[in-house]
Amino acid sequence: MFEGKFSAEDRQDIKEAIQKVFGDIEKDTESYNYYSARNLCKELMKKFTKTHDGSGAIFTLNQDVFIETHCHDANIQCIYPYVAQMFVPNQPYKIDNISIKTKISKYERYVAKHNGDLYLSYFKLHGSINWRLESNDSLLITGGNKLAYINKHPILEEYQNQFAAFLNKPNTKLLIVGYGFQDMHINNLLQKASSDA
Protein backbone atom coordinates (compact mmCIF):
# COMPACT_ATOMS: atom_id res chain seq x y z
CA MET A 1 0.00 0.00 0.00
CA PHE A 2 2.77 2.47 0.90
CA GLU A 3 6.07 2.91 -0.90
CA GLY A 4 9.29 3.48 0.97
CA LYS A 5 10.92 1.88 3.96
CA PHE A 6 8.06 1.55 6.42
CA SER A 7 7.98 -1.12 9.08
CA ALA A 8 4.87 -3.28 9.41
CA GLU A 9 4.06 -1.32 12.57
CA ASP A 10 4.40 2.01 10.72
CA ARG A 11 2.14 0.76 7.94
CA GLN A 12 -0.49 -0.33 10.46
CA ASP A 13 -0.27 3.03 12.24
CA ILE A 14 -0.78 4.85 8.93
CA LYS A 15 -3.80 2.70 8.05
CA GLU A 16 -5.33 3.30 11.48
CA ALA A 17 -4.72 7.05 11.19
CA ILE A 18 -6.45 7.14 7.80
CA GLN A 19 -9.40 5.16 9.18
CA LYS A 20 -9.68 7.52 12.15
CA VAL A 21 -9.73 10.59 9.88
CA PHE A 22 -12.47 9.06 7.73
CA GLY A 23 -14.43 8.13 10.87
CA ASP A 24 -14.20 11.72 12.09
CA ILE A 25 -15.33 13.01 8.69
CA GLU A 26 -18.29 10.61 8.77
CA LYS A 27 -19.35 11.88 12.21
CA ASP A 28 -19.11 15.49 11.00
CA THR A 29 -21.12 14.67 7.87
CA GLU A 30 -23.89 13.04 9.90
CA SER A 31 -24.31 16.16 12.02
CA TYR A 32 -24.18 18.57 9.07
CA ASN A 33 -27.67 20.07 8.83
CA TYR A 34 -27.43 22.91 6.34
CA TYR A 35 -30.55 22.12 4.35
CA SER A 36 -29.67 23.96 1.13
CA ALA A 37 -26.21 22.38 0.80
CA ARG A 38 -27.53 18.90 1.61
CA ASN A 39 -30.40 19.37 -0.83
CA LEU A 40 -28.00 20.51 -3.55
CA CYS A 41 -25.88 17.41 -2.98
CA LYS A 42 -28.93 15.13 -3.18
CA GLU A 43 -30.18 16.76 -6.37
CA LEU A 44 -26.74 16.44 -7.96
CA MET A 45 -26.58 12.74 -7.13
CA LYS A 46 -30.01 12.18 -8.66
CA LYS A 47 -28.52 13.38 -11.96
CA PHE A 48 -26.20 10.36 -11.88
CA THR A 49 -28.79 7.74 -10.97
CA LYS A 50 -30.02 5.00 -13.23
CA THR A 51 -33.42 3.77 -14.07
CA HIS A 52 -33.95 0.60 -16.05
CA ASP A 53 -32.87 2.36 -19.25
CA GLY A 54 -30.20 4.66 -17.80
CA SER A 55 -26.45 4.29 -17.76
CA GLY A 56 -25.23 6.69 -15.07
CA ALA A 57 -22.41 5.89 -12.70
CA ILE A 58 -19.96 7.58 -10.40
CA PHE A 59 -16.33 6.56 -10.42
CA THR A 60 -14.36 7.99 -7.53
CA LEU A 61 -10.90 7.99 -6.05
CA ASN A 62 -12.36 9.07 -2.72
CA GLN A 63 -12.43 6.45 0.02
CA ASP A 64 -14.92 8.01 2.44
CA VAL A 65 -18.64 7.22 2.68
CA PHE A 66 -19.97 10.70 1.88
CA ILE A 67 -21.88 9.62 -1.24
CA GLU A 68 -23.40 6.58 0.45
CA THR A 69 -24.62 8.78 3.30
CA HIS A 70 -26.27 11.29 0.99
CA CYS A 71 -27.76 8.62 -1.27
CA HIS A 72 -29.52 7.16 1.73
CA ASP A 73 -30.85 10.59 2.70
CA ALA A 74 -32.10 11.13 -0.87
CA ASN A 75 -33.80 7.70 -1.15
CA ILE A 76 -31.33 6.52 -3.77
CA GLN A 77 -30.02 2.97 -3.65
CA CYS A 78 -26.23 3.07 -3.69
CA ILE A 79 -24.77 -0.07 -5.25
CA TYR A 80 -21.14 -1.20 -5.37
CA PRO A 81 -21.09 -3.23 -8.61
CA TYR A 82 -19.75 -6.79 -8.23
CA VAL A 83 -20.05 -6.56 -4.44
CA ALA A 84 -22.98 -8.21 -2.70
CA GLN A 85 -23.78 -5.06 -0.77
CA MET A 86 -25.98 -2.08 -1.37
CA PHE A 87 -27.50 0.65 0.71
CA VAL A 88 -31.26 0.68 0.39
CA PRO A 89 -33.37 3.75 1.13
CA ASN A 90 -36.05 3.62 3.82
CA GLN A 91 -34.03 1.04 5.75
CA PRO A 92 -32.04 1.65 8.93
CA TYR A 93 -28.80 3.22 7.78
CA LYS A 94 -25.47 1.87 8.90
CA ILE A 95 -22.16 1.77 7.08
CA ASP A 96 -20.61 -1.48 8.26
CA ASN A 97 -17.35 -2.96 7.22
CA ILE A 98 -18.00 -4.69 3.92
CA SER A 99 -16.22 -7.93 3.06
CA ILE A 100 -14.58 -7.86 -0.35
CA LYS A 101 -13.77 -11.13 -2.08
CA THR A 102 -10.14 -11.55 -3.00
CA LYS A 103 -11.09 -13.46 -6.15
CA ILE A 104 -13.86 -12.74 -8.62
CA SER A 105 -14.74 -15.18 -11.36
CA LYS A 106 -14.87 -13.43 -14.71
CA TYR A 107 -18.39 -14.85 -15.00
CA GLU A 108 -19.48 -13.75 -11.54
CA ARG A 109 -21.58 -10.63 -11.68
CA TYR A 110 -23.58 -9.36 -8.76
CA VAL A 111 -26.79 -7.84 -9.99
CA ALA A 112 -28.48 -5.81 -7.31
CA LYS A 113 -32.22 -6.19 -7.01
CA HIS A 114 -33.28 -2.60 -6.78
CA ASN A 115 -36.66 -1.85 -5.28
CA GLY A 116 -37.05 1.73 -6.42
CA ASP A 117 -36.65 3.75 -9.57
CA LEU A 118 -33.43 5.48 -8.55
CA TYR A 119 -30.16 3.71 -8.01
CA LEU A 120 -26.55 4.68 -8.34
CA SER A 121 -23.69 2.46 -9.46
CA TYR A 122 -20.77 3.65 -7.38
CA PHE A 123 -17.28 2.48 -8.33
CA LYS A 124 -14.58 3.20 -5.74
CA LEU A 125 -11.43 2.88 -7.82
CA HIS A 126 -9.01 3.04 -4.87
CA GLY A 127 -11.04 1.07 -2.33
CA SER A 128 -13.02 2.34 0.62
CA ILE A 129 -12.63 3.03 4.30
CA ASN A 130 -15.36 0.46 5.02
CA TRP A 131 -14.07 -2.34 2.77
CA ARG A 132 -12.33 -5.33 4.33
CA LEU A 133 -10.49 -8.17 2.64
CA GLU A 134 -10.99 -11.76 3.78
CA SER A 135 -7.84 -11.25 5.90
CA ASN A 136 -9.70 -8.34 7.62
CA ASP A 137 -7.15 -5.86 6.23
CA SER A 138 -8.64 -2.66 4.89
CA LEU A 139 -8.76 -2.18 1.14
CA LEU A 140 -7.37 1.34 0.74
CA ILE A 141 -4.98 2.13 -2.10
CA THR A 142 -2.73 5.08 -1.29
CA GLY A 143 0.78 6.26 -2.11
CA GLY A 144 2.63 5.64 -5.34
CA ASN A 145 2.50 2.73 -7.77
CA LYS A 146 -1.25 2.37 -7.29
CA LEU A 147 -1.77 0.33 -10.44
CA ALA A 148 0.40 -2.50 -9.08
CA TYR A 149 -1.80 -2.66 -5.97
CA ILE A 150 -5.00 -2.37 -7.99
CA ASN A 151 -3.92 -5.34 -10.11
CA LYS A 152 -3.55 -7.43 -6.93
CA HIS A 153 -7.22 -6.95 -6.01
CA PRO A 154 -9.76 -8.32 -8.52
CA ILE A 155 -12.55 -5.94 -7.48
CA LEU A 156 -10.36 -2.89 -8.06
CA GLU A 157 -9.01 -4.33 -11.29
CA GLU A 158 -12.60 -4.86 -12.49
CA TYR A 159 -13.53 -1.31 -11.47
CA GLN A 160 -10.55 -0.01 -13.46
CA ASN A 161 -11.78 -2.02 -16.48
CA GLN A 162 -15.31 -0.68 -16.03
CA PHE A 163 -13.98 2.90 -15.86
CA ALA A 164 -12.16 2.37 -19.16
CA ALA A 165 -15.30 0.83 -20.70
CA PHE A 166 -17.52 3.73 -19.57
CA LEU A 167 -15.01 6.27 -20.91
CA ASN A 168 -15.07 4.59 -24.31
CA LYS A 169 -18.85 4.40 -24.68
CA PRO A 170 -20.24 6.64 -27.44
CA ASN A 171 -21.51 10.04 -26.27
CA THR A 172 -20.01 9.65 -22.82
CA LYS A 173 -20.08 12.76 -20.68
CA LEU A 174 -17.44 13.09 -17.99
CA LEU A 175 -17.56 15.43 -15.01
CA ILE A 176 -14.29 15.72 -13.09
CA VAL A 177 -14.41 17.28 -9.63
CA GLY A 178 -11.39 17.83 -7.40
CA TYR A 179 -8.92 15.64 -9.27
CA GLY A 180 -5.31 16.85 -9.39
CA PHE A 181 -4.23 14.53 -12.26
CA GLN A 182 -1.50 12.88 -10.17
CA ASP A 183 -2.52 9.26 -10.85
CA MET A 184 -0.91 8.12 -14.09
CA HIS A 185 -3.13 5.04 -14.43
CA ILE A 186 -6.19 7.33 -14.44
CA ASN A 187 -4.54 9.91 -16.70
CA ASN A 188 -3.64 7.20 -19.22
CA LEU A 189 -7.26 6.02 -19.40
CA LEU A 190 -8.52 9.59 -19.83
CA GLN A 191 -5.95 10.32 -22.53
CA LYS A 192 -6.68 7.10 -24.43
CA ALA A 193 -10.44 7.69 -24.35
CA SER A 194 -9.94 11.28 -25.50
CA SER A 195 -7.70 10.31 -28.40
CA ASP A 196 -10.02 7.45 -29.45
CA ALA A 197 -13.10 9.70 -29.44
Task: Tell what function each PLM region has.
Residues 1-10, 44, 48-142:
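Extended, H/D-rich, highly charged conserved domains that either
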Residues 1-31:
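N-terminal accessory alpha/beta regions
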Residues 9, 32, 58, 151-154:
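Short, surface-exposed alpha-helical recognition segments that flank or form part
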Residues 17-23, 135-144:
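Short, basic/glycine-rich phosphate-binding loops at helix/coil junctions
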Residues 28-35, 145-151:
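Surface-exposed cleft-lining segments at the edges of enzyme active sites
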Residues 33-48, 155-163:
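A short, well-structured juxtamembrane/interface segment
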Residues 38, 64, 180-182:
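Short beta->alpha connector loops
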Residues 150, 155-157, 161-197:
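SIR2/sirtuin-family catalytic core signature
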